Amino acid sequence: MRRAALALSPQSSYTSEPLDFSLLSFMDHGDVILRFSDVSFSYTHNKPILKEANFSIREKAKLTLIGQNGAGKSTIFKLITGVLSPQSGSIHKRHGATIGIAKQVIPHHELDCSVHQFFQSSFTEKKYDLTRDIDRVLDAVNLSVPHDKLLNDLSGGQKARILLANALITEPDILLLDEPTNNLDQQGIDHLTSFLMGYEKTCIVISHDSAFLNCFTHGVLNLDAFTHTIQQYVGDYYDVVAEIAAQIEREQQQNARMEKSIQDRKVKINFFSHKGGK
């Protein structure tokens, strides 16, 4: 079933202020970690991504973000991280909540770092159990490399896995993954799936791998390219996609009936118009 969207008054900034849970009486207290309120965003005047979109995400939720190619899924991630700001409306995250997302490339100045140094740079303070944590996240992406190996000596696929593992190591409160299985073989996908199934914080994933998504997600955010809003659904991936497909079919049938009704009325009007003119 579709989850209700929030309808709240617009503001004009990205904030990390504590949420006003009194507005969310239909949810468990303290359960919401991220909320979009009447958010609108577009790159150009005639290409809107969002129009007054409203949705909220609970703590520990594991969700899939879907939408047509070019609808703006990666843009949603940039709005969540604060790389982009909404033109109107507001985006709230729970006070103190951290956000993690895998970088697309390793910064040039870090290529001379060792694997250990690269992971250490993700923390503001020295982490004494880092070796254990590195092993844990490298296992999550099915990668085995010496911790003293230079990043510059890794293959392109190994670097991609290092970047993914680096997003996991800080255990962010909101983990954003954009096509995380692209550089993984099946064993790597299995390892990542197992890691995410045990991940006890919020995770939002963009992926075309339906089997991967169906294993661990329990809800869908659907970015509608026509209404430029986000609809929320609860259920496993296959069930939700089937529900959305059925909904689209019902809407198409309804539109077809309406079109037929309009055409029938036009025929009657034309008939009586011609008859009256004789």
Residue ranges and their predicted role:
Residues 17-27, 266-278:
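Alpha-helical coupling/stalk and coiled-coil linker elements that connect catalytic or binding modules
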Residues 5, 252, 259, 263-266, ...:
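Alpha-helical coiled-coil heptad-repeat register
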Residues 1-3, 13-255:
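ABC ATP-binding cassette signature C-motif
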